[in-house]
Swiss-Prot record:
Disulfide bonds: none
Enzyme Commission designation: 2.7.1.23
Species of origin: Streptococcus mutans serotype c (strain ATCC 700610 / UA159)
Keyword NAD part of the UniProt annotation: yes
Family as reported in the entry's similarity comment: Belongs to the NAD kinase family.
Chain positions recorded as NAD(+) binding sites: 55-56, 131-132, 157, 159, 170-175
Protein name: NAD kinase
Length: 277
């Protein structure tokens, strides 16, 4: 019997949350893959990242490996209800292993968000978001110009602004009244957070869908502290000069799953459920 070379093996990382059910599943999966000659368990530069928990766990794993997006693929196991990023439930480990054994490198890829914040002192901070990025002002009302492709669109007054990806459209964006976009649509969505609209101040008041090649700029008009959120991370900065949002050249890729639950089925399951008409 010929032993597989290390370089021939599929490098797999397992990332899980701290819940009891997730820990049990991690131990089971780790034991199986450790004794399988086709796989090599490592968290360093993996080919496949398996997340165990929920969509929040996959968000964390995305940020852990966002510098490896050119070659890494993700696959999620949900230990609760089926999520938007997780294809397997906790009782479907055998199905996952079967699919990994027959895997030929096929993937499903979706756009992500590139965010560049320029501070008043000239420093630039660049991040990537899988779901959304928001900006809020800590003190008083946020006043900011919204610029799309170098064209001044509106002066916003309110609590803040959210820019989401298609996959993130079902998250915070939806709770703000934004539209749900299919993840294969390469576009960004700008949604206002509690905008002021009266006889004096006016904004569009509805979400804006921006195509792939367009860039959104938010230019704050007041000095002070701002809270910037990138998915499940938050940062506080003073005197933000502008923030630019655009679709990143890289994408997130998932292991192609034969029994993949369709996006619209997930939307129905998450927000509508089954009912008798």
């Amino acid at each position: 019997m010929t032993q597989m070379n290390f370089t021939d093996k599929i490098k797999v990382a397992i990332i899980a949350n701290g819940k009891y059910q997730s820990k049990r599943l991690t131990a089971k999966l780790f034991a199986i893959l450790r004794n399988d000659d086709r796989f090599y368990l490592t968290k360093k530069n993996p080919d496949i990242v398996i997340t165990i928990g929920g969509d929040g766990m996959l968000l964390s794993a995305f940020h852990m490996y966002e510098k490896c997006l050119d070659h890494v693929r993700f696959v999620g196991i949900h230990t609760g209800h089926l999520g938007f990023y997780t294809d397997y439930r906790d009782f479907e480990v055998d199905k996952l292993l079967e699919n990994l054994h027959s895997d030929k490198g096929e993937k499903a890829s979706y756009p992500i968000l590139k965010v560049t914040a320029t501070l008043a002192d000239g420093r630039q901070l660049t991040s990537r978001a899988l779901n959304e990025a928001t900006i809020r002002r800590i003190e008083k009302t946020m006043v900011a110009d919204v610029v799309i492709n170098k064209v001044h669109f509106e002066r916003f007054r309110g609590d803040g602004i959210s820019v989401s990806t298609p996959t993130g459209s079902t998250a915070y964006n939806k709770s703000l009244g934004g539209a749900v976009l299919h993840p294969t649509i390469e576009a960004l969505q700008l949604t206002e957070i509690s905008s002021l609209n009266n006889r004096v101040f006016r904004t569009l008041g509805s979400s804006i869908i921006v195509p792939k090649k367009d860039k959104i700029e938010i230019v704050p008009k007041r000095l002070g502290s701002y809270v910037l959120s990138i998915d499940n991370k938050t940062y506080t900065h003073r005197n933000v000069a502008k923030i630019e949002y655009e679709i990143d050249r890289k994408k997130i890729s998932f292991v192609s799953t034969p029994s993949h639950t369709s996006f619209w089925e997930r939307v129905k399951d998450a927000f509508i459920g089954d009912f008798d008409s």
